[in-house]
Amino acid sequence: MNELIGVIRIRGWAATPWYIQDTLSMLRLKNAFNAMIYPKDSSIQGMLNLVSSYVTWGELNDEGLRLLVSKLEISRGKKVNEEYVKDKLNVDFQSFVESIKDGKLRLNKLDEIFSLPIRLHPPKGGFKGKVSRPFRAGGEFGYRGDKINELIRRMV
């Protein structure tokens, strides 16, 4: 199984330097509460380190992956259903999730089929810390390991 990283943008665009905005657009995270799924890779890790004060990320488990894939959209407001996945990719929905988990399909390469990035809601109950502090210091941004799945559960 390839290790997958869930990345969520938690801060907006105001007073963001151009090189941070450029990197966030390469990661397809143009607005706050947008999310993407990437394989764990050194190039992705370098971009995440550059924009770490604007995003939070961590390793996805099966539940977090399933929740994020369930929030995929065909177009604005239209959710992906099993018939759409069967029609476009010729696999059922469970096989689609398994192929993403195994690394056979890369979700970030399927932008002609799905409307990317994945749009999420603000977390239920609010953020537990300040958005302007790193996660390990009691804040919200930066690397959070497997605790990203708890945040995804609250944002879906």
UniProtKB/Swiss-Prot annotation:
The keyword GTP-binding does not apply. GO terms for cellular component: cytosolic large ribosomal subunit. It holds the Pfam family Ribosomal_L30. It comes from the Archaea. The keyword Transport does not apply. GO terms for molecular function: RNA binding; structural constituent of ribosome. Belongs to the universal ribosomal protein uL30 family. Part of the 50S ribosomal subunit. PANTHER family: 60S RIBOSOMAL PROTEIN L7 (PTHR11524), LARGE RIBOSOMAL SUBUNIT PROTEIN UL30 (PTHR11524:SF16). This is Large ribosomal subunit protein uL30. It comes from Sulfolobus acidocaldarius (strain ATCC 33909 / DSM 639 / JCM 8929 / NBRC 15157 / NCIMB 11770). The gene is rpl30.
